Amino acid sequence: MNIYDQLQVVEDRYEELGELLSDPDVVSDTKRFMELSKEEASNRDTVIAYREYKQVLQNIVDAEEMIKESGGDADLEELAKQELKDAKAEKEEYEEKLKILLLPKDPNDDKNIILEIRGAAGGDEAALFAGDLLTMYQKYAEAQGWRFEVMEASMNGVGGFKEVVAMVSGQSVYSKLKYESGAHRVQRVPVTESQGRVHTSTATVLVMPEVEEVEYDIDPKDLRVDIYHASGAGGQNVNKVATAVRIVHLPTNIKVEMQEERTQQKNREKAMKIIRARVADHFAQIAQDEQDAERKSTIGTGDRSERIRTYNFPQNRVTDHRIGLTLQKLDTILSGKLDEVVDALVLYDQTQKLEELNK
């Protein structure tokens, strides 16, 4: 099936979905209505571009016809030739755009995410940088109109984070932040450095798609749930009722502790969200490691410990090592203006996938 046949199939299905979504039987079935609405939305950009492309093809035919019928009118012929030139250029642009729109979509792209940031090598400075990354993602999420909720946080004594877990919810969150997983390196002079020497520290970021219960079912027998008293600063118990929850997935020994909420039920719900995402991610990682040819056709090696980006404060420079992108805009990027980096990563990924398809 060539690209035009594929596009026609997508348009036919889109029109069918429009009819189904106005069917009273479908409207009354909430689950089916939501599934079909999601499918329609995922095809909308492709169909709009395809219809515009067909109009451009018609413009080419019309311009060629006008040239034939110009009847020696030099001005009319010149106008028609310019229109033909413009339409042919548009045709090439649309063909590239449509190839990208037809690339297989990551099924997780529309999902919310669980974001984990940890201070790694570098002690207090690494923990402080983890806090800087948290602020960067919070501000980026705010600019995108997403909801950002810190679910779990473990701070150190200087205001940094040993570990912080957040839920980011909104439109196409995973599609934009999935490239952030990996080791982020910072080069700067710590506040405590009296000699003015630049230190290098690292924080790690992990982005996992949110996994609904219906998508990934964990056998309750595989979980151990412990209930205990939440503790505050200094380790003292802050609740008379045991509200903190620890859940361990026994087959993998993946553990989540949650005590941020006031009730045991809410802590348990949040802990289950995180453990479901971590367990699903654990097994997805194993499956992907077995297909490393596919993994290496995307950005980087996919290794979670891979150094993906360096933030150099003295030079106000950010370098993404996977795509060779260097920007002298560190202050802007850390303030949440990540679009230039994200767009470059998305474009690189699309280009790599197109090259794979053309082989």
UniProtKB/Swiss-Prot annotation:
<dbReference type="GO" id="GO:0016149">
    <property type="term" value="F:translation release factor activity, codon specific"/>
</dbReference>
<dbReference type="InterPro" id="IPR050057">
    <property type="entry name" value="Prokaryotic/Mito_RF"/>
</dbReference>
<dbReference type="InterPro" id="IPR045853">
    <property type="entry name" value="Pep_chain_release_fac_I_sf"/>
</dbReference>
<comment type="function">
    <text>Peptide chain release factor 1 directs the termination of translation in response to the peptide chain termination codons UAG and UAA.</text>
</comment>
<keyword id="KW-0963">Cytoplasm</keyword>
<dbReference type="GO" id="GO:0005737">
    <property type="term" value="C:cytoplasm"/>
</dbReference>
<dbReference type="InterPro" id="IPR000352">
    <property type="entry name" value="Pep_chain_release_fac_I"/>
</dbReference>
<comment type="similarity">
    <text>Belongs to the prokaryotic/mitochondrial release factor family.</text>
</comment>
<dbReference type="InterPro" id="IPR004373">
    <property type="entry name" value="RF-1"/>
</dbReference>
<keyword id="KW-0488">Methylation</keyword>
<keyword id="KW-0648">Protein biosynthesis</keyword>
<dbReference type="Pfam" id="PF03462">
    <property type="entry name" value="PCRF"/>
</dbReference>
<dbReference type="InterPro" id="IPR005139">
    <property type="entry name" value="PCRF"/>
</dbReference>
<dbReference type="Pfam" id="PF00472">
    <property type="entry name" value="RF-1"/>
</dbReference>
<protein>
    <recommendedName>
        <fullName>Peptide chain release factor 1</fullName>
    </recommendedName>
</protein>
<feature type="modified residue" description="N5-methylglutamine">
    <location>
        <position position="236"/>
    </location>
</feature>
